[in-house]
Design a protein with these regions (language model features):
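Conserved short beta-strand edge segments in small beta-sheet-based binding/regulatory domains
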Residues: 511, 544, 553-563
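A structural signal for short secondary-structure junctions
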Residues: 362-363, 373-374, 475-477, 527-529
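Alpha-helical transmembrane segments and immediately membrane-proximal extracytoplasmic
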Residues: 1-443
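Conserved NTP-handling cores and scaffolds of large molecular machines
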Residues: 214, 410-414, 503, 517, ...
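Long, low-complexity, intrinsically disordered cytosolic termini of multi-pass membrane proteins
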Residues: 431-479, 487-488, 502-503, 517, ...
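Cytosolic Rossmann-like ligand/nucleotide-binding regulatory domains
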Residues: 482, 486-546, 550
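Intrinsic-disorder/low-complexity, polar/charged segments enriched in Ser/Thr/Lys/Arg/Asp/Glu/Gln
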Residues: 298, 478-482
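A general structural signal for short secondary-structure boundary/capping elements
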Residues: 415-417, 427-433, 528-533, 555-562
Length: 563
């Protein structure tokens, strides 16, 4: 109870810090955009920040200075990031997810402030990236540093990282429920959640939403018509949009990561690569200035039905390339806003084809493309409806996003890059964070079992031995082993106690079976399934004879980063 009370207090603190950090970053980004794009290039996109209404402004030089400014922004960002903290490059959400899975939630203290400045330079100079990645990393980074300063456990540090991520995103997108779910859904590429953390991410995101509302108001990010909704026949049109969005969602990660790989292979110092990406964006902007920045103002114009069909379709592809150039070259920014932009333009084009009002299709299109490409369908449905206030479209959004998600998963199976977030793992069973929990459970089982452990073997030693996959020699001449059941083994589908009867435990005794993140005791009804990990005590010769059924297995428990 005391631990839970402390964590609830942590959620309130992180909610407040997340909201303040998000507002500070938004202010810094706005001022940088005014300085670089506004004063140097003489250009202001419509709706600077937060999707507010406003018109496009061009100076006396038109668009011709934009390539110089985008190149300058990329150069400054690259010099800052690669000179001081390379992990601040790219889209920050992926860095936070990677820290959760592989680094015990450790994010270096310098990353958050560097990410804030580098992202402001990238996006403020016209880079086609969003606020979500930097905000997520800034607030998650504070949660990590706060946990390390308080000497919290690895488990609590990971939880505080998720709380921070939810809080920052809630403030920036004004979406308390969707972002709470996003923080626990974005960890996995399959339909899985870290549900145990939902209580804490929800409280943190609601606190951040409330603090942000107190500071800047309670209006949704985008304005939608009050009579927006969907009739029965519209669901067929939304179904078609879901199919198209799923196809686009397949290619979004592919274009992004292939361009990133191309930049990595260039024989150019990494400090200068974001400048090359910035030059590419600037050249695209000479023809389509709508690709600059996050593009919230242009999304609002699409909702209002003020863009032509040709422009809408052109921007689907132009923004995809522009955002890949920005973030793939090493620029600092998020992938959420560009993905929303692509989906919004696709939805607007669908409305143009179907001769329907644009607002509903733009909103649902935003959710469908990102929900499929990032494989976060549940969170995206809620986030987009909260960001727009379009709650009457919840059913249509659910249908469209789920269709997009299913098509994206099916079609991307043979692709190298299947999701926008490279650090995602398929499910809890694949996360080193949860492998640690399984190992701790295994050690506890050994403590309470009849296994004769070496007297000098501590819990830490035992965890390290089990994680390495090296058999542990026991004083009675037996070995503690871990193996993965092969998919074609004849043991698949048979009861564990049928294969290894308790009466023959002197030859092999099953201690536990690890399956999909859970630790199972070898009870009478437990059946072997492919890829089960079995921990057992056996004789050396007997284990060698079982090699046709079990392959060696090591638990990936990640690495601990520095503070």
């Amino acid at each position: 109870v005391k631990r839970q009370q402390r964590l609830i207090l942590d959620t309130v603190l992180l909610g407040i810090i997340g909201a303040l950090g998000a507002r500070l970053f938004a202010f810094l980004l706005k001022e940088t955009e005014i300085l670089l794009l506004g004063r140097l290039a003489g250009y202001a996109p419509p709706g600077v920040m937060d999707g507010a209404a406003g018109g496009e402004v061009m100076g006396q030089h038109g668009l011709w200075l934009i390539p110089l400014v985008t190149t300058l922004g990329g150069l400054l960002s690259g010099m800052l990031v690669y000179g001081l903290s390379p992990e601040a490059e790219g889209h920050g959400t992926d860095t936070a997810v990677k820290a959760f899975h592989y680094a015990s939630g450790v994010i270096r203290a310098r990353v958050a402030p560097l990410k804030m400045v580098a992202s402001a330079l990238t996006i403020g100079s016209g880079g086609a990236a969003g606020q979500e990645g930097p905000t997520a990393l800034i607030s998650a980074g504070f949660g990590s540093v706060y946990a390390s300063a308080g000497k919290r456990t690895d488990e609590e540090r990971r939880l505080l990282v998720l709380m921070g991520m939810a809080a920052g995103l809630s403030a920036i997108f004004r979406s308390p429920i969707g972002t709470a779910i996003f923080a626990i859904e974005v960890l996995y590429s399959d339909m899985e959640l870290d549900a145990a953390a939902l209580l804490y991410t929800m409280v943190a995101s609601v606190v951040a939403y409330a603090v942000n509302g107190l500071l800047v108001g309670w209006e949704p990010l985008f304005r939608v018509p009050p009579d927006i909704g969907a009739e029965f026949v519209d669901y067929f049109r939304y179904g078609a949009l879901g199919i198209a969005a799923g196809i686009v969602a397949v290619f979004l990660p592919t274009v992004f990561y292939n361009l990133r790989d191309a930049f990595h292979s260039l024989p150019v110092p990494p400090h200068f690569k974001p400048a090359l990406g910035g030059l590419g964006i600037g050249l695209i902007a000479l023809a389509l200035p709508q690709v600059l920045g996050g593009g919230y103002g242009w999304i609002q114009q699409a909702i209002d039905g003020r863009l032509t069909g040709f422009i809408l379709l052109s921007l689907v592809f132009a923004k995809m390339i522009a955002f890949a150039l920005t973030v793939g070259s090493g620029g600092s920014g998020g992938v959420f806003a560009p993905s929303l932009f692509v989906g919004a333009m696709l939805g607007g084009f669908a409305a143009h084809i179907f001769h329907q009002p644009a607002a509903g299709f733009v909103i649902v299109g935003m959710a469908a493309v990102f929900g499929g490409a990032a494989r976060v369908p549940l969170a995206t449905i809620l986030m987009v409806t909260e960001m727009t206030g379009g709650y009457h479209l919840l059913g249509a959004a659910a249908l469209t996003v789920m269709l997009s998600y299913m098509i994206q998963v099916a079609l991307s199976e043979s692709f190298r890059y299947r999701t926008l977030y490279e650090a995602q793992v398929p499910g809890r069973a694949d996360s080193p964070a949860h492998h640690v929990e399984q190992l701790e459970c295994a050690v506890h089982l050994l403590d309470t079992s009849r296994v004769c452990m070496p007297p000098t073997c501590t819990h830490l030693d035992l965890r390290a031995l089990i994680a390495s996959g090296i058999p542990v020699d026991l004083p009675d001449g037996k070995r503690l082993v871990i193996g993965m059941l092969k998919q074609k083994s004849s043991y698949v589908g048979k009861r564990v106690q049928q294969v290894f009867p308790p009466r023959k435990r002197e030859r092999l005794e099953v201690v536990a079976v690890f399956r999909q993140g859970h630790t199972l005791l070898p009870h009478a009804g437990l059946l072997f399934q492919p890829d089960d990990r079995m921990m057992a005590v056996t004789t050396p010769g007997n284990w060698e004879r079982l090699a046709e059924h079990f392959s060696p297995y090591t638990f990936d428990v990640g690495s601990r980063g520095g503070g």
